[in-house]
From Swiss-Prot:
One of its GO terms (biological process) is DNA-templated transcription initiation. Belongs to the TBP family. This is TATA-box-binding protein. It comes from Pyrodictium occultum. Keywords: DNA-binding, Repeat, Transcription, Transcription regulation. The gene is tbp.
Amino acid sequence: MESFVTPQRRSAAEQEPKPTANIENIVATVSLDQTLDLNLIERSILTVEYNPEQFPGLVYRLDSPKVTALIFKSGKMVVTGAKSTRDLIEAVKKIVRNLKKHGIQIYGRPKVQIQNIVASANLNVCVDLERAALTLENSMYEPEQFPGLIHRMDEPRVVLLIFSSGKMVITGAKREEEVYEAVNKIYEKLKKLRAIRPC
């Protein structure tokens, strides 16, 4: 007895393109709750840069994870370049370990606070920015000044730069999850407003 297998048709929901997002940069402040002798750090760790006449902080670059830390006498650090929270924490631990290894005493545990996450995203559809600007609250679109629509989202509290190609830049997130939440939320809003179409 012959059996025929008919190919299953994909539902419209399965065929619908899904938005994607990538974390590009995490900026965080770190507090060591103690003062640091930057001259001693410069003498101990040869790879750092310290030129107090030009800038009051010491520049410490890591290759893996690829981050840059600005270290100040106050024991505060600004860390940039991490592509994930995990990389950020790993970088801070590595810096503190290296300082200790070179005889710099660190007494407490570093307190890390994310200040800003910058991400890129692609809705994988084209956006009618004119329509979106008219119907999307907290938005500004002035194409003669800037080609993208600026949307300030209340929850999560982020700013999205949306381009007609469906590409976006997201700033202001404090947690990685907020980036993905914002991308999905704006996609659903634009879809509901009929401001998206296949490219």
